[in-house]
Design a protein with these regions (language model features):
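Conserved functional hotspots at enzyme active or ligand-binding sites that engage polyanionic ligands
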Residues: 1-33, 37-114
C-alpha cells in the first residue's frame, strides 16, 4: 500500500485517506487512521470534508460498511462516527479510491441517520 500526498482540492467522494483524528473526546475514534471521504467537493467550503473512520475491529452494526476484499485498506467504515474536518489544516495521505458500490452503500446508510 503506497500512500501519496495530495492537495485537499484533489480529494473526491470515495477516496480512502490516512489522517490524524485527534483531538477527540470520549469514545470517538482516535489517532492516525484510515477513513473514507463521504462528501462531494463543496464549492463554497472546499476545505471541509465529511469523513468516516475505518476500523479493523469488525462488529456487526447496521451503520458499519465492510470494505471490499480487493482493497488495500481492510476493515469497516464507522458511519456513526462521521464528522466534518478541515483538511486544509490537517495533513493526510491518499491511499486509494473505494468502489462506487461501497460509496453508494455508505451514502444511503448515512442518509438514514438524518
Amino acid at each position: 500500500m503506497m500512500a501519496v500526498d495530495k492537495h485537499f482540492s484533489e480529494l473526491r467522494q470515495g477516496d480512502i485517506i490516512f489522517l490524524d483524528f485527534n483531538p477527540t473526546k470520549g469514545d470517538e475514534q482516535k489517532g492516525y487512521r484510515p477513513c473514507i471521504v463521504l462528501t462531494k467537493p463543496l464549492r463554497y467550503l472546499n476545505y471541509m470534508f465529511g469523513v468516516a473512520p475505518i476500523t479493523t475491529k469488525a462488529k456487526q452494526f447496521p451503520l458499519h460498511v465492510s470494505l471490499t476484499p480487493e482493497m488495500h485498506v481492510q476493515g469497516e467504515v464507522l458511519l456513526e462516527q462521521h464528522r466534518m474536518l478541515d483538511l486544509e489544516t490537517r495533513s493526510f495521505k491518499f491511499v486509494e479510491r473505494a468502489p462506487i458500490d461501497l460509496v453508494t452503500e455508505c451514502t444511503i446508510k448515512l442518509k438514514l441517520m438524518y
